[in-house]
Amino acid sequence: MAWNEILNHQSAFERFQRSIDRNRLANTYLFVGPPGIGKRTFALKLAQALLCEANHDSPLMPCNQCQGCQQVFAATHPDLILVSRPAKKSIIPLEAFIGDKEHRRQEGLCHAIGLKPFRGGKKIAIIDDADYLNQEGANSLLKTLEEPPPGSLLILIGTSEQRQLSTIVSRSQIVRFEPLSQSQVFEILNSKSIVENDAISLTDLANASAGSLSTAVMLSDPECFEFRRSLFQQLATRDPGQNEFAKTIIDFAESAGKENSLKRDRLILAADFAITFYRQWLLTITQAEVDPDRVDPYLATLTQEKFGD
């Protein structure tokens, strides 16, 4: 994937370009923004550029052909460390940072990033799901954050500064990523050949995505799409019955299956939908002007009918 295929993040690209041109690349960055907008893709492209073995005049332009570029693309580069929350875990386990009890400080991110680079001139670690770092995990990173090994780069990826521990935020350069526009989400969905059905079009998915590709893909499941609209209808009644409202959410979570992690993800999704509703409600009652490409016509019409003048 080329940089120009990573939509809507030109300002972040230019920021790193300036930092590299001035030889002022920081050791730790915190990428924040809604899920599903390309933060992880951007981090991997940056890693590919920094670990590219080709000689070229533009340090942020990887050749995509050398062994280094190919290994980053395949997530097998010896100087790239990737950490994320396991699917069935509620947090990133401590072992990911300092190894298990038998190999404390001999394995994990903190050990690996301190080793001499094998191929490239840098060691790069990317922590996805930084929202799920607990205090113990953050504390294990303190020495790496305060005394970064020479030539190391650590990128943490989360949804907001508020969800990060203060020990992380205070030691990181913050890079903010904005949601995609609906037209950009539509373009990506169309390129990925997401299949439309009789009830849900790609336009419906893009409009409902809140600028998040992952949300759009999730909503391609008719059950999720219908739940979203049902939830909005209940919230729009001004006084939704507590029992019925709770049952709607619980039934949606339970239908995900037996895995608690899947149920938890659906509860988080329900909370995100509620936030989306009340954001639009505020826009409606304050009559604020908003870019039409970032408004869900269905939700805007619903809130206008229920709460508009």
Segments (PLM) and residue ranges:
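Charged, glycine-rich active-site and insertion segments that engage polyanionic ligands
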Residues: 1-49, 57-60, 150-152, 159-273, ...
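"Short basic amphipathic alpha-helical interaction patches in structured regions
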Residues: 96-97, 142, 169
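Loop/turn-to-beta-strand initiation segments
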Residues: 120-124, 149-155
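Conserved catalytic/switch belt of AAA+ P-loop NTPases
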Residues: 139-153
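Short, well-structured alpha-helical patches and their helix-loop capping segments
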Residues: 101, 105, 122, 133-137, ...
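Clamp-loader machinery-focused feature within the broader ASCE/P-loop NTPase space
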Residues: 2-136, 302
